[in-house]
Design a protein with these regions (language model features):
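Catalytic domains of cell-wall/extracellular-matrix polysaccharide-remodeling enzymes
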Residues: 1-113
Length: 113
């Protein structure tokens, strides 16, 4: 708990020093979250509804196919931008889903809507 809390606070401080804004939301690594952190830090966890397991493959087509065949309204897609294949897939996913009529919104818009 203490290590996670420190990492979140350090990240918030780094983001605030650049943007002048504090973190409101975060994606917990591995989806592991403890309610106590939410209360202590005033940060809301944002979980995902589609995980194409992009970290297990470099096959862009496989990642794209998994997402676009599963995507439904209000889904949150988990991708890792540290992999070139995931970045390439994300660009294709956005184009395909927009062609299908999907709209991409901020977390604020999704949660408050």
């Amino acid at each position: 708990d203490d290590e996670a809390k420190k990492e979140i606070l350090d990240t918030d401080e780094a983001i605030f020093s650049i943007t002048g804004k504090h973190v409101e939301y975060m994606r917990p690594p591995f989806g592991i979250w403890q309610r106590r952190l939410e209360l202590d830090l005033e940060v809301l966890p944002v979980m995902w509804s589609i995980d194409p397991l992009d970290w297990t493959t470099e096959n862009v087509d496989e990642i794209v196919n998994k997402v676009v065949t599963e995507a439904e309204e209000n889904d949150i897609i988990l991708l890792h931008d540290c992999y070139d294949s995931s970045v390439d897939a994300a660009l294709r996913i956005v184009d395909i889903l927009m062609e299908k009529g999907f709209e991409f919104v901020t977390v604020d818009e999704l949660i408050l809507d």
